[in-house]
């Protein structure tokens, strides 16, 4: 895809140029339209993985104050280049500008969303104190899992068949193409690097399956990214969820949003957000619940056996995503350690690589 090298060139030039514009000044300009004149900005805490993020208190001229969550480009050049090449920040901004108000799931209130081709700023409500934000190493409770499965079914029913090329949602399909293009070059070396870092955390048989998956990415992609498509979150682990009253979920971090198969979200969530024993005992119940809810919400009536096979195949992607996350340092190590343990157990239990029928 020609836009990938063009994006890399633009971002590389911007990194070399640098920025002398303080975050406080940018926040004042960004929030003027939605909140009014900003008198002072107090930063609370900050961190950086795929993007740089901070919590801040904004003091307004009217005397009110508002706590916000701000996302800006990563301060690590290699991470920023990879994230922009994948179109992730542009996708999240586009989601909040075009879809956030219409999806049937809870998302943070957006106060500002802008991407200019090289830099971006996203300002969201700060959920601290209003919703529970689990640590990424935690596992969902049974009640939380049921609520997330219901919400995913509602989201997928809403988005079923919506992403179409040449239409307003065509960018969601373009993200599939971009992921496939980058995977051609990066999937195998990143898988090797991630497995090297994981060491004995990934059993040899599972590591061999992961490498076979990476070498045969074209065959795997045809099975995992083909039609029918719906709108998927595409990164639904517990670190990207918050829970409100009665454990109703709120979905965070939409930078991976795209068109895709329903099983991508369901298998990813069950694989990475559930304790392996809970997943083993509850995944069939969750799958049946998902199918019934999807159909009741206006989606298709999925065949039970075909749904189970799709779920098995997509668990392999959850493992691949975790290995790649480890390779590029896109999450804290304690989080990737927890996800690796869950993902290796899932692909082993479900015989996921065999379900993909990949050549040796």
Predicted regions and their residues:
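Conserved structural core of kinase catalytic domains
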Residues: 112-147
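Active-site acidic catalytic loop and adjacent metal/ATP-binding pocket
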Residues: 47-60, 69, 215-262
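Conserved kinase catalytic-core helix
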Residues: 133-171
